[in-house]
Each structure stands twice: as structure tokens, then as C-alpha cells.
Amino acid sequence: MTNLVPVGRALLSVSDKSGLLDLARALAELEVELISTGGTAATLRAAGLKVRDVAEVTGFPEMMDGRVKTLHPMVHGGLLALRDDDEHLVAMAAHGIEPIDLLVVNLYPFEAAVARGASYDDCIENIDIGGPAMIRAAAKNHRFVNVVTDTADYKALLDELRAHDGATTLAFRQKLALTAYSRTAAYDAAVSAWMAGALKSEAPRRRTFAGTLAQTMRYGENPHQKAAFYTDGSHRPGVATAKQWQGKELSYNNINDTDAAFELVAEFDPSEGPACVIVKHANPCGVARGATLAEAYGRAFDCDRVSAFGGIIALNQPLDAATAEKITEIFTEVVIAPGADEEARAIFAAKKNLRLLTTEALPDPLAPGLAFKQVAGGFLVQDRDAGHVDALDLKVVTKRAPSDAELADLLFAWTVAKHVKSNAIVYVKDGATVGVGAGQMSRVDSTRIAARKSQDMAQALGLAQPLTQGSVVASDAFFPFADGLLAAAEAGATAIIQPGGSMRDDEVIAAADEAGLAMVFTGQRHFRH
């Protein structure tokens, strides 16, 4: 095979030392000469391996606290030289440049420094310069050079070398080069994103998003679509950080819905009591607080028992046995919680297809972050919706002010409405949703659909009155006309929370007063598309 290239010399310079010694020993057994830098060389020597310092190769000492060590023609010439170009070979001979056939580099842990909240100066010091330069050089010259940037590829490298008597194929080197360029692109994207945040640059001239492959999937949102899941390095608690205890591999839709459920349940402080969210197609179909987690689940389930079948459940407290027992009474796709006790896990173990995820923590709903949406030819970027209101932010605009009980439910409903696809209408009573209207083009239609579903559920539960009787209503945006408010009143609602800001606010307020409703304005909108 003419594309086989033997490996005779390797340069190793790694921050992550895991697997390093096994790799180096195997390379030594294959009679590969080892060159290394600083701490990597010290680790290899301590293990009894023969290694040349890069300073010996360059004839120049490491300097400036290690900032300058591999940025030298003796290194980059060895990586970039074309082995079949006579001029390159003459230049190498003239300057004593030795070819480097294998580069093993993993970069300074910049992303980890950012994740732990390191200072600005510390983050700057964790930006690798020499590593990316060598990686890009080796990847560019992959016709002749192997470049390994991920410890997960050590085994594949050794398997390749052993299969070809110490050489590698072009196809293998191309695969490594792709991984290498992906790594340097992601690294630069992480630095750029961090600096944009640190310098409070709202709209940098260029924006790059990067991720690390976590999972390939059988298909995407639909069976004809290919899909994969990538983590972004932010370590925000959720699906990306969760431990899966049991069940089948998560699907594209599972991940999308589970994220929606967990972000909503995180809005409810666990120190203020248990809360449960049930989601279907990224929309909540039941949300409730309770004296116990099991009660919270039961109340959320009673909002829409039909839609809850095959849904996603998110809890704001660790799963306990009593709640686990209730959940197993119907088919559920995924349960996500900060934790799960041993007895609860044992109960779930009997349901092999039920996926259980634990995260150890809840995401901070007020934390800054970015959200983006792809459009033809570009993408939209905005701050994550971290909007929040409390009782002091509300403006009473009707003759009647809400009671304390109504006020508590209004704030609960407003929190839920933030996570419902627009146009969103949410009915709440006693700390539980009793009707959710989502995704309608007309706000009055969302109001009526939520009320009708509530009536259907009341009949199924054998109740004489609809669940919305005596409830409060949240609307994610203003009522453009009074019709939506009147539909809510007709369904039995007694109080309304909405942003306000319509040119017909006066008409809507007058209609609320005539119906005896209390209404408050938040001054904040929560469109969700």
C-alpha cells in the first residue's frame, strides 16, 4: 500500500497525562524515538522511558514560563516538510531538521479553567499557543504526519501501528486530521466565547459555537433525519451532565423534551417544597407543587392525564420510593431529578425501558447564557430567557387586587407560561396547573383550548365543575383584545397575570373590572417559539 507511512519519531506534549505512559511504552516497543516537553518529559523519564527534550532538538531552551518552547523551525519544519518534495528534503538536510511522524498533543485545560470560575488572568494563562500551532501544522501535513489530540484515540493509534508494522494508512491519518482541526476550532471558539463574555461584548463581529460529540443517534426528530448530541462544555446541569441509571439510549426527542422539563422544574426552589413537571413535545402538560414529591407528581398528572402518557417527568428534589411507585403506574419515557434514592432505583429497575437520569444539581434559571436558532443563511443569537418577576414587580391595574392565594398562583402560572410555546395560556389553582394552552396562532384559541381540556379532565375525574373554576390565568404576552380575558373568565378564572402593553389595555382592564377579575401587569413578556 503506497499510502503507508512508517512512524519513527514522535513528539509528545500533553496536559492530560491519562494513558500517556501506556502509549509511550507501546511506542518505545515499536522503536519510535520519543521527543517531549517540560512536564510530559519528566513524567516519561520518571517511568524509565528514554526521551529527548524538545530543547535538545531546537537548540533553544524553554523560556518565559514555558510560553515559548515548541514555536521553532526545528519543530515546525519537522511537522510541515513534504517527504516527497526534493526542495523540502534539501532544506531539512541543510538545517538539520528531523522529520516528526507523530504528534501527540492535548491542550492546556482552558475550558476547565473557565468552568471552575478562574480569574481573567488565570484563564489567559490557560490559553495554549504552541499546542494549536503544532496541531494545525501536523494536520495540514497529514499525508505524512499523524496527529493525536484525544486520549480516546490512543488505542486506535496503537492498533493501526501494530496492524501495519509500525506504519499508518492515509485514511487513518485523514481521520486524525479531521479530529485535530475540530479540536482546535472548538478550542478557539471556547476562547472567543469566554472573552466575549468577559469583555461584555454583546455582538462580537464573529460568533462560533463548538461542541464535543456525546452520542450518535439512530435518527433525529423524524426517522429520515440523521442526528447526534454534542456537549458545549458549559457544564450546566441537565441532560448533558446527567448520569443515566437505566433504560434505552436517549433519542433526539427524549433529549429535547427532557431539557425543556428540567429547565422548567429548576424554576421552583427545592427549599420551598417539592415540584414536578410533566412535558410532552417540549410543552408542559402538568406542573405542580405538593407537600410531598409524590403529591406534586399526582397533581401535575391530574392536569392532563391523557397527554402525560409517554411523557417526560422532571423533579426538583431527589426521587423517592413513594413517587417512583406512582410514576410506574403509567408508561413514562424519562425521569430526570437531582438524585434518586436506592429504593426508588430498585422500583424503577422493574421497568427496563424507563430511562432514569440524575444530575446532582439543578440549573440556575437566572444564570446568564446564550440561546440560538438557525435560519436560512445564518442564525439568531440572544440571551437565555432569565426573566423573573416577584410580587413587588407586579402592577395591579384593576379595581380589585388579587388575594394572597391568587397572587401565589399568579406567580406560579407566570413561571410556567415562560416555558410554554406561544401563544401560551396557563390556568393554575392551588399551586398546580389545571389547563395549558400552547402554540396557537390566536391567544383566545389558546385560552379556550386550555379550558376545554380542563373540562374534559374534570369529567374523567368525575368532578362536577371544570378544574379551571376558581383558577388564575397567565398569558405570556398581552391580550390584544378583551376576548381572551373574557374566555378565561367564562372558564371560571378569577385573576389574570399578563405583561400589559397593548394599545387596547384600557378596554381589557375595563372588561376585567366588569367581570370582577383581579389583573396584574408584569411589564415583561415571555414569547417562546
Swiss-Prot record:
Instruction: Give the molecular function GO annotations.
Output: IMP cyclohydrolase activity; phosphoribosylaminoimidazolecarboxamide formyltransferase activity
* Xref: Pfam families: AICARFT_IMPCHas (PF01808), MGS (PF02142)
Q: Where is the MGS-like domain?
A: 2-149
EC assignment: 2.1.2.3, 3.5.4.10
Q: Per its UniProt record, what Gene3D superfamilies does this chain match?
A: 3.40.140.20, Methylglyoxal synthase-like domain (3.40.50.1380)
Q: In which pathway does it act?
A: Purine metabolism; IMP biosynthesis via de novo pathway; 5-formamido-1-(5-phospho-D-ribosyl)imidazole-4-carboxamide from 5-amino-1-(5-phospho-D-ribosyl)imidazole-4-carboxamide (10-formyl THF route): step 1/1; Purine metabolism; IMP biosynthesis via de novo pathway; IMP from 5-formamido-1-(5-phospho-D-ribosyl)imidazole-4-carboxamide: step 1/1
Tell me the InterPro entries matching this sequence: AICAR_Tfase_dup_dom_sf, Cytidine_deaminase-like, MGS-like_dom, MGS-like_dom_sf, PurH-like
Query: Which keywords does UniProt give here?
Result: Hydrolase, Multifunctional enzyme, Purine biosynthesis, Transferase
Q: Which NCBIfam families match?
A: PRK00881.1, purH
Family as reported in the entry's similarity comment? Belongs to the PurH family.
Name by which UniProt lists this protein:
Bifunctional purine biosynthesis protein PurH
Organism of origin: Cereibacter sphaeroides (strain ATCC 17025 / ATH 2.4.3) (Rhodobacter sphaeroides)
* Biological classification of the source: Bacteria, Pseudomonadati, Pseudomonadota, Alphaproteobacteria, Rhodobacterales
The primary gene name is: purH
